């Protein structure tokens, strides 16, 4: 459970209805931005969540390129909100547990890399660079 790549496995609440609602919330977030989870993985898998975050960044870049600054701001806000509500806390626990509780070389290194990346983003802020160039403010 400590190294499960699923967000819901890191929550203290194991109620099935709570977990079902959390998965529905994630899928709703994805659908709101035109992404549907069609893989064999659940919506709370780290690969699904990181794919969604990268998708939001891509949409933001394309919106900026096309001069759609309102849409760009929506993507920025969604990225920040998703990271805060659905990703950062559990991903940090997952990264630290992977770095310290898995045997071998690759996964502990990957866990440390993720942990450092999350700490860097927390320190500098996910939108530090983007907000500096934001033409809507």
Model-derived features with residue positions:
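Surface/interface-facing alpha-helical segments and adjacent flexible terminal/loop regions used
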Residues: 1-137
